[in-house]
Amino acid sequence: MRNTEMIPNVPVSFQRTRRMSKGRVLTSGDAGKILPIKADPILREEGFSGNVNVSVEMMETSEKPVNAIVAKACTYFVPYLAFDQFNGSIDELNRSYSKENGIAGSPISFFEKNKYYNGSSVVTDSTPTDMDTGDNGRSTFYGTMGLHHGVADMNSSYVQAYNAIVNHRRKARSTSLAVRNEFEHDLAEAFWPNEGNSHIMADFDQKLIDGEVALNGLTFSAPLRSTMAGKNDNSLTSGLATSTTDSFSPASVLADVTFGSGILRPDGTTGSAFLFSDVWAELTQGGDARMSLADIEQARKTAAFAKLRAAYDGIDDEYIIDLLMQGITVPTEVMKQPMLIGSQTGMFGFSQRFATDSGNLDDTATNGFVSLGYRVRAPRTSIGGVVMTCLEIAPERVWERKKDYFLYTTDTDNLPNALRDSLDPEKVAVVKKNHLDVNHSTPDATLGYAPLNHEYNRDQINVGGKFYRPANDAYTEVRSRIWTNETTDPSLSTDFYLCTNLHKKIFADQVSDSFEITAVSDLTVDTNVVFGQRLIEADATSDYETITNLVDATRITK
């Protein structure tokens, strides 16, 4: 007998099965973009594990590139709660899944369908026929993934998952990077690889580093003094009269006098006002500032908790951060953002071939190749979502004019000093714009901020000899083997973080896609899905009927 005072809320248990989610991809793309390679749907109450392998071939270049070219493959699990229509609410997701009205009273579609972003607003295609060939990036997005669209509705889960990944990474990198619309189909810019300047920040929390100690005993009234005061006058001079009805000395400040109307006020208007010169307050009377050891300890604890809170940057809801800071577990919070479940980075290796005909023995052709592989896994979740594999290809950025701080040191006082630096209360250095380019037009302007003595964690790339960059940035053929964006007057703008406007001058074919990509994914999914038995092809004669006819169905009659 069931205890009638208990209502069960455990879901019905089914025999678990396994389903395969395999994929082979052949596609192409350019460097400087985050390429969506493969997407696998994960249903509710499913977990998975498997392998992802990606191979990339770089198309022919006339010369062998001299700087590193990096490929990075990463696979994310994007839960459905990361999609905007659910607003991070598991209750909203469950209602939507069951086609019930949402919390606001109106139904919410579990699958957004036929939507794309046109640059200013989200558009719903009422007669979807061209999602794989349409404008606003749709043909590029679905074409890169190798997906075709028939005359039917198409859900937007893949593009939503893609943009959730991009936005998650941008928030983690810098608050200055723009967030994309979740239905934007244009391919996002890739991040620069092996960035040796990621320690430089545009701003920092100075209060977090300095700390603040409250001083008690300063809530008192202090006498206010002035060497000269007057009214109804546009200015004060040393010869100001003190006996007329329009002016007064400090000794008669409290006198009952009549205001005039001719004073030029700080806001530019004219009217009645007093003018004071050399104003000060006497703080020696009535005040007693105190700072206790408890105040110092409070400042230390405040700074420590502020550092913990800073780690939650990127979570949109302040109340969620407040709950986490109180030590309260928010079970669904981890399901509101993409989860990196596997990644690998590799550099291209090059194969150079020389011409064999007698007239062109100096001519060469170069191809590059890189292979990446890793395992992925995720436990069983009640949410479900999309597993998406993305690929980024970009050359290593070459800061040829990056400052060598030791070379510019002419005084030992400018070298690190353990005692002085240990006593430094902030341990933060101001980074000038000549850090990235010693020929910057405003070398002493502030680029950003970095940890103290950051310049002695050296990460230099020096290019010299025939490859030396000329002062006027004039084009030289030999330097065309360096594949990079030569930025004039670099700053902490979008170009500093993302591969914007990456050229294709090093390739023999500057029109076609520069990289050919093959990928193989093999996932085993633990699921509740019920599969039918394997079918056996049969002819017109039923095997079941044949066997039935052989059975003696008669019974003995008594």
Summary of predicted features, one role per range:
Residues M1-K558:
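Intrinsically disordered, low-complexity segments
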